Amino acid sequence: MFVTRLMQEKEFTSGVKPLRLMERSVFSDRMVFVRAVHEAKWMNEMEISIYDCWFDDVVSALPGVVPDGFIYLRAIPDTCHKRMMLRKRAEEGGVSLKYLQDLHEKHESWLLPIDSGNHGVLFVSKPSLQMDNSLHPDIKDRVFYLEMNHMHSSIQKVPALFLDCEPNIDFSRDIEAKRQYTRKVAEFFEFV
């Protein structure tokens, strides 16, 4: 995944700053998926150290891989698993609930770490009053800044939009919910 992100960055590099919406970033690759591979013992300590050095060098050399903002579509693993089962995509057939639980825990501990006292709570760091006033009222209570010790230095203070995507929302049938979420994402893009 990391190499794919870098190739995308190289492809998009031009004089104009593009608007890109990506499913994952190099940071979610590092903080979620590489951690999962390491914990599964598919990557040893030496390999993780090499990866970290390489990661830091590449992020420093290619500032375009640092996003202007993150959007966290938050749902519990059971909800994600049920939605996957309903989609019936062949490539998702082998994804277990346990795997989704592991990824969810890694996303939560990355974005909402336990030592901050905010694990499982939608709060990291509120925007400053000046920034807060520039936020659209529909997303004002959903935008936070990533600023924890475990965050990579290049994403400290990057805004994140947290959206709850729980089972009571059926985006395939509820057109109004889809419009509301689309508006929130558009308002966040306008903000960043």
Where do the model's predicted regions map?
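NTP-dependent small-molecule kinase module
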Residues: 85-192
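Short, structured active-site "lid" loops
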Residues: 1-7
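ATP-dependent NMP and nucleoside kinases share a basic, alpha-helical "lid"
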Residues: 9-109
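Generic surface-pattern signal
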Residues: 2, 14, 56, 60, ...
